[in-house]
Amino acid sequence: MSARGKARSRALDVLFEAEQRSASAFDVLRARREKTDQIVNPYTLEIVEGVVSRQQAIDEFLETYSQGWSLERMPSVDRIILRIGTWELLYNDDVPDGVAVSEAVALAKTLSTDESPQFINGLLGRLQQLKPSLLA
């Protein structure tokens, strides 16, 4: 797994834990740093900050274009993967669109249900098509 792939996976862990514990993602990051004394990958921090700062808009896009799936109905891990993928796709110009989608699908293949990769690919693919109008 690439350094950015590991950073995505760690960001997913942080965001997932924060959601499950109803805690701040930054508190989760801080607690992890204190426990391990490890330096947090800068890209992990960038993802967490980006998703947290844009979560309302990201969730609105996901809710609007998920066709019959509310955020609450989605498995938690899928919801977090979609938030990361949407942030990379729409708000991180350093990541090519295709990479954002394929990395999100790869996380889903590893961490979620058999149906999740196809769902995530379809939803992020739709957002990719609509990207110019979504950011206008």
Swiss-Prot record:
Keyword RNA-binding attributed:
yes
What is this protein's function? Involved in transcription antitermination. Required for transcription of ribosomal RNA (rRNA) genes. Binds specifically to the boxA antiterminator sequence of the ribosomal RNA (rrn) operons.
Q: Which UniProt keywords apply?
A: RNA-binding, Transcription, Transcription antitermination, Transcription regulation
One GO molecular function term?
A: RNA binding
SUPFAM superfamilies, A to Z: NusB-like (SSF48013)
Family indicated by similarity: Belongs to the NusB family.
Protein name according to UniProt: Transcription antitermination protein NusB
Q: Which GO terms describe its cellular component?
A: cytosol
Q: What does the record list as GO biological process? A: DNA-templated transcription termination; transcription antitermination
**Pfam families assigned to the protein according to its UniProt record, in alphabetical order:** NusB (PF01029)
